């Protein structure tokens, strides 16, 4: 699950505390961008078929907390990056798949 991977990566970078205590958004965003690039490069280089599940984050309300807004924005960027290198992409709502790509 890409959502859990993103959350765990932020956790590995001590991101939640950094956002709450120091507002290190730019530095953390740069570190995450590097992690995202490494993931997408690895996915693009594999010869295996990979199915990735993630959460859609663009349809909801703007979160009140800075940490939640940061997470939503980063997951959105990661979703875009992974969809860009994917051969196909579907959005599934209420069990109904809609092909995006």
Which residues fall in each region the model found?
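Conserved proline-anchored active-site loop of SAM-dependent methyltransferases
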Residues: 1
């Amino acid at each position: 699950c890409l959502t859990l991977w993103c959350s765990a990566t932020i956790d590995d970078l001590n991101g939640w505390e950094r956002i709450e205590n120091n507002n290190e958004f730019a530095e953390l965003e740069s570190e995450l961008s590097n992690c995202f690039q490494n993931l997408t490069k690895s996915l693009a280089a594999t010869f295996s078929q990979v199915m990735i599940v993630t959460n859609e984050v663009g349809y909801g309300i703007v979160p009140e907390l800075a940490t939640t807004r940061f997470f939503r924005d980063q997951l959105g960027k990661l979703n875009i990056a992974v969809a860009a290198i994917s051969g196909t992409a579907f959005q599934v709502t209420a069990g109904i798949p809609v092909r995006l790509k």
